[in-house]
Amino acid sequence: MLTIKNWQLLSENDKKLCLSRPRQSSAIKENVLEIINQVQLSGDKALYDLTKQFDRVNLQYLQVPQEKIEQANIPKNALNAITQAIGTISSYHQSLLPENTEISTASGITIRNVYRPIQKVGLYVPGGNKTPLVSSLLMQAIPAKVAGCPIKVLCTPPDAEGEINEHILVAARLCGIDTIYAIGGAQAIAAMAYGTESVIKVDKIFGPGNSYVTQAKTLVAIDADGAAIDMPAGPSEVMILADTEANPEFIAADLLAQAEHGPDSQVILICDECELANQVNQQLEIQMSYLSRIEFIKRSLANSRIIICSNQSEQLDIINSYAPEHLIINRKNPEPWVEKIVAAGTVFLGSWAAETMGDYVTGSNHVLPTSGFARNHSGLSTLDFMTRFTVQAINQEAIRNLGPAAMTLAELEGLDAHANAVQIRLNTLGD
């Protein structure tokens, strides 16, 4: 079960180790670079070869035929659930649409903010250990649709027969995506970043994935010929802050829900006393016994821990230092804590706020910064699928009033051509 650590008894170095994430292999970067190079050099052929190598599938095609998307069919209960999720996710992301604004900064000057959808976006949906990660698709496709992105392509790994799960096809169809590639892993990221004979080169790539996918996204983002990315979204994680009144059964369930994502997921509980910690560990044993992904969970829990800390100021320091992807404040009065949180992907308030609800149906986006990136990144939103540019209108009055100041600043920086561009206009005005 989870190791219990008393925060007050730890050295500064031990505290850092207590909040450290599982380390990724240094060999991953080299392997991913090789995959990217293969795709750049050999295009479609590399995609077929790499899919055979990693997925052990001989693909019949890279792009899913249109008729397969149109004919895909799923059980009614699944269709209803997807439709309900689309409703809440759409409502939330519609609320994030920005308005074009205009301001006058000085007499004769107006500046407008203009927002436009990114023209070509690539969405990546992981394989999900042979299960269809429909929610990952919805969390990307819906804000892309709301933003108005005209070209939306989807890459997701094929199954053993080289096909895409029909739940994914139906969800994509409902979200207006008709360009789907049966490609996964780092090779999918490379294909969308650079393009191949069959795969469209996109402007920005979205979506979570394993360490290979995350590394590939990072590498293509720093290449001028590659593509922008949403964020480095790696292994999933949750941190729970609980008081003595919290239900240990609920806490254990939330920890396990995150741990089942994969062996490199991490879960951390912060609580006031050992009694609750022991009760949670007992519940973990009970609930694990009937869950299907027990091997994933066991390996994840080995990377995880319970921290005993009764000082609220120190509890906040732990949270903000760790910057969790998901933070659950399972306390009697959680709201006052929010204003003191400075780094978290998303925050769930109260005992009924199961993180599972946020994963699927609240409407908030579940593509969130991990590995501490919540310190400087936000969760995915409609704005991530848009660009903003300014429109500046400057008339003669502004040239007269502010031109001399612009010239002075240009000359201070040794840029006489800049100053000249204003001086010529002042000369024309006769000033």
From Swiss-Prot:
Name what cofactor the protein needs. Zn(2+)
Q: Where does NAD(+) bind?
A: Y124, Q187, N210
UniProt superkingdom:
Bacteria
Write out the catalysed reaction: L-histidinol + 2 NAD(+) + H2O = L-histidine + 2 NADH + 3 H(+)
Sites where the protein binds Zn(2+): Q258, H261, D359, H418
Q: Bound how, and how many: what does the cofactor note say?
A: Binds 1 zinc ion per subunit.
Tell me a GO cellular component.
cytosol
User: What does UniProt list as catalytic?
Assistant: E325 (proton acceptor), H326 (proton acceptor)
Q: According to the UniProt entry, what is the EC number of this protein?
A: 1.1.1.23
Annotated GO MF terms: histidinol dehydrogenase activity; NAD binding; zinc ion binding
Acyltransferase among keywords: no
User: In which pathway is this protein known to take part?
Assistant: Amino-acid biosynthesis; L-histidine biosynthesis; L-histidine from 5-phospho-alpha-D-ribose 1-diphosphate: step 9/9
UniProt xrefs under InterPro entries: Ald_DH/histidinol_DH, Histidinol_DH_CS, Histidinol_DH_monofunct, Hstdl_DH
Keywords (alphabetical) are: Amino-acid biosynthesis, Histidine biosynthesis, Metal-binding, NAD, Oxidoreductase, Zinc
Q: Which residues form the signal peptide?
A: none
Q: Which GO terms describe its biological process?
A: L-histidine biosynthetic process
* Pfam families documented for this protein: Histidinol_dh
Xref: SUPFAM superfamilies: ALDH-like
The UniProt record gives the binding positions of substrate as S236, Q258, H261, H326, D359, E413, H418
Q: What family is this?
A: Belongs to the histidinol dehydrogenase family.
Q: Which HAMAP family match?
A: HisD
Q: What does this protein do?
A: Catalyzes the sequential NAD-dependent oxidations of L-histidinol to L-histidinaldehyde and then to L-histidine.
- State what protein this is by name: Histidinol dehydrogenase
Q: Which organism is it from?
A: Legionella pneumophila subsp. pneumophila (strain Philadelphia 1 / ATCC 33152 / DSM 7513)
Output the lineage of the source organism.
Bacteria, Pseudomonadati, Pseudomonadota, Gammaproteobacteria, Legionellales
